[in-house]
Amino acid sequence: MNEKDLLTRWEERIPDADEPSYMLLMALCAVSSHTAALEAVFDKTLLEDLAIPDSKQYFTEAVSKIPARFSAPQDFDYLRSFGLLTVYALQSGNNNDLHRYLGMYHALVAEYGFHDESRWPDDISLSEVDDRRRLFWCVYRLEIHSSCVFGHTVRLPEAQVSVYYPRITPTMDPETQAWTIGWDYITDVFRLLEYAIFGLRACKNRKALLAVLCDRPSPTMLLDSLAQLKASKSRTLTRLHDPDSEFYSNRCRYMAVQISCIETTTTIMALLYCQAPARDVMAVAEKFLKKLSSAPLIMFKIASSQIVHQLLGVGHMLSNASRYDNDQYRTEAKRLIAFLGDLVKSLESVVPAAGSAGDKLLRLAEANT
């Protein structure tokens, strides 16, 4: 939701319980209270003297309002609600709920063509067009993330999508413009990550007649596309770490961490797809870990389970890479995975999923002995 809508939407009244807007409000409260309970906010004064309700109550209330049949299926609030319920499930570590509500979201997308802007209502405002674009790509990124981490299929490949990115307008302040530029860049990297996933997982026993119609991208093409994307990165994004920059806000600094994580994940997956030398994979991981270890703790709090999932994925990819080149990099892989495990384990007090993920990484490190 855009900030203005968020501030004014429910200012005057709470909607009736049978309205889609009420379901959206409850889903939003579930995600917000879960975040507040973890103190995953940049300004802790917002939580002072605040009794934080149980997020499960809001979640249960939102779920109870899902209709058996959608009388107004084009209502944008249903799509927003399912997106937020999916986020809540991911944050809570409930994969069953994640697939349930992501599936409901995709059911509405499929039935009413949300993946194609030409099928959207003609009478919506430019502001709602941008909101719809933002929601679509946010859920797309969430699905690619969960597909990468949990191994499920990508339900809506980007090749079948006809949705633009939200507009960058002259009325935006410089910080918001920088954030939007970064948001677009991250989405581009996720779209490349989808092809890396496809390259690594593509069906190996497809009939020859069909195989020629759905060739995987060549390894060099994938790496070249990633290199071109990085090379064309806006100069604005290179200034997010500069304390003297007008873009040195909390959310832009957090975005810089996000960019580093998704670039590393995509690069390593592309290298694995190319069967690149293990030393190349280790070098990328080492550079990433040095940068990540200097990030403030609050950035990990804000990222929550998503960054833990990504770090666990990096550990598994390092383990796979260590088997190349006659196992000569197993010792190096063990060192890096153990470092990852210790880093993730240290987040246990602020990210609930970190404890078990850290243990998995440490066991994985020992397995590489």
Regions found by a protein language model. Name each.
Residues 1-19, 54-61, 109, 189, ...:
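Transcriptional activation interfaces
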Residues 1-94, 174-177, 238-256, 274-276, ...:
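C-terminal transcriptional activation/regulatory domains of eukaryotic transcription factors
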Residues 20, 24, 74-77, 127-131, ...:
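Structural signature of alpha-solenoid helical repeat junctions
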Residues 24-25, 29, 77-78, 82, ...:
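TPR repeat positional signature
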Residues 89, 147, 269-271, 318:
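Residue at a conserved register position within TPR or TPR-like alpha-solenoid repeats
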Residues 110, 114-118, 123-227, 290:
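Fungal transcription factor middle regulatory core
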Residues 162, 195-205, 236-239, 254, ...:
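Fungal C-terminal regulatory tails
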Residues 211-291, 320:
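Cytosolic regulatory protein-protein interaction regions
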